[in-house]
């Protein structure tokens, strides 16, 4: 028992790596090959495991050669360390777990419990951990960066005029974000400003004393239908009663004043078209002609009847 325990300690085999059956094989071969005090027995520790390789072949289907199981059991850990950075840099790829055999990934075989893998930062040290974090830094969620930029930009623009280096009335560059808020899109809800010079003035000449108040009454523009109905009414009657004027104004959507003014203008046009004299001028001419000059009337009066008609009989006084 002392010899078998010494052989186990000399080979540096951890109890969890080889199966339980190998301990009995090592203990039996150790007593036969090495003596209790012989030196050659201590210098050949790999010999006993190589003799029992045929027994271990059925338990390792993934091993390629006869010496690969010994390498997986007795090789130092540094030979398997290059697999950790690849697994840490590409954690999303699942093909890495199926492509590598059990002996290469973690030294585990189907006949023994799997060994828990250590994180790359603990296996490689602080230098390799920083390298892995530096490579994984671009994989952080990038959409969060552009979302954080818009809130920070207005704060900078608002704080720019308050800096003591730039004067209040100086020519500091305007912030484009503040100018965008004052764009015409933001003034949609407000009514447009109408200045006095933008108003239309219906006067023939420019009035220098005009102060921008209410402009002169504009000319009424009648539609073709309204003019047609008014012409029909004027054809039958050139003068309207108040009742008829109210009916026409209500029918044509006009005011009574507009209908009255239209008929007045239409009567003046009708008189001009028919060349009728003005009634006021004709009455004045008739009055002047009937009066006549006084001298001309006296001279013409004796010539009206200069001599009596012979046929007329005049009474003759008998006393003469």
Swiss-Prot record:
Disulphide bonds in the chain: none
Biased composition (Pro residues): 139-153
Expression sites (tissue/organ): Embryonic nervous system.
GO MF term list: DNA-binding transcription factor activity, RNA polymerase II-specific; RNA polymerase II cis-regulatory region sequence-specific DNA binding; sequence-specific double-stranded DNA binding
Compositional bias of kind Gly residues: 28-41
Ranges of biased composition (kind: Low complexity): 52-62, 159-168, 310-320
Biological-process GO terms, alphabetical: anatomical structure morphogenesis; anterior/posterior pattern specification; embryonic skeletal system morphogenesis; positive regulation of transcription by RNA polymerase II
Function comment: Sequence-specific transcription factor which is part of a developmental regulatory system that provides cells with specific positional identities on the anterior-posterior axis. Binds to sites in the 5'-flanking sequence of its coding region with various affinities. The consensus sequences of the high and low affinity binding sites are 5'-TAATGA[CG]-3' and 5'-CTAATTTT-3'.
Protein name: Homeobox protein Hox-A4
Organism: Homo sapiens (Human)
Lineage, highest ranks first: Eukaryota, Metazoa, Chordata, Craniata, Vertebrata
Gene this chain is encoded by: HOXA4
């Amino acid at each position: 028992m002392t010899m078998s325990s010494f052989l186990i300690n000399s080979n540096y085999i951890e109890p969890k790596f080889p199966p339980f059956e190998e301990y009995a094989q090592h203990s039996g071969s150790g007593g036969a090959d090495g003596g209790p005090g012989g030196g050659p027995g201590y210098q050949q520790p790999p010999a006993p495991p190589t003799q029992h390789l045929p027994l271990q072949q059925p338990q390792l289907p993934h091993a390629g050669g006869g010496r690969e199981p010994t390498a997986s059991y007795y090789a130092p850990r540094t030979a398997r360390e290059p697999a950790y950075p690849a697994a840490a840099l590409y954690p999303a790829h699942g093909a890495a777990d199926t492509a590598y055999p059990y002996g290469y990934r973690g030294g585990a075989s189907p006949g023994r419990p799997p060994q828990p893998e250590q994180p790359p930062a603990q296996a490689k040290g602080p230098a390799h951990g920083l390298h892995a974090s530096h490579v994984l830094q671009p994989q952080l969620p990038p959409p969060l960066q552009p979302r954080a930029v818009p809130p920070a930009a207005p704060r900078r623009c608002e704080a720019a005029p308050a800096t003591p280096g730039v004067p209040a009335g100086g020519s500091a560059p305007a912030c484009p974000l503040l100018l965008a808020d004052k764009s015409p899109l933001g003034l949609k809800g407000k009514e447009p400003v109408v200045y006095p010079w933008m108003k239309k003035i219906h006067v023939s000449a420019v009035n220098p004393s005009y102060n921008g108040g209410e402009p002169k009454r504009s000319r009424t523009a009648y539609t073709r239908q309204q003019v047609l109905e008014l012409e029909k009414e004027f054809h039958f009657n050139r003068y309207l009663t108040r009742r008829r004027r109210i009916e026409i104004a209500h029918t044509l959507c006009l005011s009574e004043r507009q209908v009255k003014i239209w008929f007045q203008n239409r009567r003046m046009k009708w008189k001009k078209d028919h060349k009728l004299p003005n009634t006021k001028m004709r009455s004045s001419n008739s009055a002047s002609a009937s009066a006549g000059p006084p001298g001309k009337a006296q001279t013409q009066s004796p010539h009206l009847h200069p001599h009596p008609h012979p046929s007329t009989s005049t009474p003759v006084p008998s006393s003469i």
